[in-house]
Amino acid sequence: MINIQNTILGKIVDRKHEELAARLKQRNLQDVEELAKAATPVRGFANALQHKRPGVIAEIKKASPSKGIIRADFNPAEIAEQYEQAGAACLSVLTDVDFFQGADENIAIARNHCALPALRKDFLVDPYNVVEARALHADCILLIVACLSDQQLEEMSKTAFEHQLDVLVEVHDEEELERALKLSEQCLLGVNNRNLKTFDVDLNTTIRLKKLLPASRLLITESGIATPDDVRMMQEHDIHSFLVGESFMKQPRPDQAFTALFGQPQTV
């Protein structure tokens, strides 16, 4: 693990451990398991992503630590509808409150207004958070290698699969990729072009790490995709899956921003 102390990521992770302790007092794991069993059926996240080209995970995000408020007029239901009409394969929904102004209920709100599967975009630190994601009606979870140990990654991905959730494992460099590749091949791999220690963006991060993967392994590029040229650059390197949020969220019509960036994705 990288040293994340004195970074934004470190502050977020510290807050997540505080949140976890508070949530465990409110509702024990057994109760959350019961809620997870009663949740709406899982929609296949990985399957949806693999059957669209380009496969776009479109993000519902109000704010971020680096940019502050990105979208003041924030309506998750309307955004989800627009993304589906534009041709998104999946949704990514921020649930972190303190740093991204997200909310747990936004997953259900978004899913109730479209047929797309949804990723719970948050900084999960314990298997409890994984079960909680299913209870919130998520179809996929995010595991960020930079803030989890190998044991946590293994345990949390296993818990996810036991609850029929897909898993997106996020890496930023070669060392993190090496750790991610120890996990089940069932896991989706995402490369964050944003350095979570400095928040600088470099699109070449995805291209560099793609070369270390078998050609058959699907890779998702995350952060910094802002122009059609950015999309073409990725496609020229056989990268066809994208997670995009800010580029859509800062435009008045996210669906029009989607089309301007990706055109009309095709079902494959």
Swiss-Prot record:
Belongs to the TrpC family. Keywords: Amino-acid biosynthesis, Aromatic amino acid biosynthesis, Decarboxylase, Lyase, Tryptophan biosynthesis. InterPro entries: Aldolase_TIM, Indole-3-glycerol_P_synth, Indole-3-glycerol_P_synth_dom, Indole-3-GlycerolPSynthase_CS, RibuloseP-bd_barrel. GO terms for biological process: L-tryptophan biosynthetic process. This is Indole-3-glycerol phosphate synthase. NCBIfam families: PRK00278.1-6, PRK00278.2-4. GO terms for molecular function: indole-3-glycerol-phosphate synthase activity; phosphoribosylanthranilate isomerase activity. SUPFAM superfamilies: Ribulose-phoshate binding barrel. Its EC number is 4.1.1.48. It catalyses: 1-(2-carboxyphenylamino)-1-deoxy-D-ribulose 5-phosphate + H(+) = (1S,2R)-1-C-(indol-3-yl)glycerol 3-phosphate + CO2 + H2O. Pathway: Amino-acid biosynthesis; L-tryptophan biosynthesis; L-tryptophan from chorismate: step 4/5. It is an enzyme of class 4 (lyase). It comes from the Bacteria. The gene is trpC.
